[in-house]
Amino acid sequence: MHGRNRTTLDREIVVSKKGKLKLAWSILGVLCLGQMAFAGGKALVEPSLTPSAENLGSLWSFELNGEYTFGSHVEKSGNLGSQAEYRYEIEALRNFRITGDYYLQLGVDYERYDFSRSNAQFPYSLTSFSGEILFSYWSGDSFYPVIRIEPGIYYTRDHVTENSFDLPIRITPGFKLTPNLYVIAGCSIDVYSNPVVFPIGGFNWKINDKFNFRAVFPRPRFSYIPNQNLEIYLGGELLGNSYRNGPTNDRRTNNAILEYSEERAGVGVDYTLRKGIDLEAIAGWTIERVYDYIRSGPINRSRGSPYIRLDLKIDLF
């Protein structure tokens, strides 16, 4: 999901810490899932019309990732105490070649956050279960979405109603400026976000065969690539989503829209075990976690804490 994770973290540019941080991420990477911008040596605007059999995209793509964020206190949370978080996500896609290096990907994505402490204002879980409709580019190694549509249910706790349905859309075309520099420009559209339409863009710069700078939101990184199977990087990450809250005794949070986000930085290792199987491990520091009831208030932020993450990606050819 990766991708998928996600992102969905569009926010009105207001004079607040959260707004400034999101604007900074947007300017630096300003790239919501615009990963087409770094499709290796192949230009997005110059696809191969008849790729060789060895270079065709996979028939199926799977991704499983899990992570743990150590406990930290949330401001203005009363006696909530130190709150830890578990998160996991599963994505499965069936890939259909349209023409050249362009594919239609259809599948499902399930993501869930579980929290060690909760109350009426802070749910014990956040869940999304969505269909995946993607128009993507195959670089020879990975798929990079140009258009992503994710119809599904996004809810807190176990409260699922007709108001839990959402339809986030992301449009992120890419362009080749030089053999080593790609840029993207597009937008994210989500009625559960504020603003509903948010501009996005960014770049990927291949410095040389060993170093790469990817200003790609939501996971920018500076990478060292000693060989074709190994990548070591220093990077950031912004993740989260918007969810429909269930009934509470507080009019500010009762059936309200909750936007949850995390900002963090860490060191990661991505290793290709064999063609089609990648394992990625990351450890770092979560700068803050934010609970934002975007249309009714309140906004609550956590203190920082360590986190660890493990991703497994499988492509079946």
Give the positions of each predicted feature:
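Membrane-embedded beta-strand positions of outer-membrane beta-barrel proteins
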Residues: 62-66, 104-108, 147-149, 185, ...
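Transmembrane beta-strands of outer-membrane beta-barrel pores
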Residues: 66-74, 108-116, 151-157, 187-193, ...
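Outer-membrane beta-barrel translocator/channel fold
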Residues: 112-120, 218-272, 276-299
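Outer-membrane beta-barrel "beta-signal"
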Residues: 201-205, 210, 269-272, 302-317
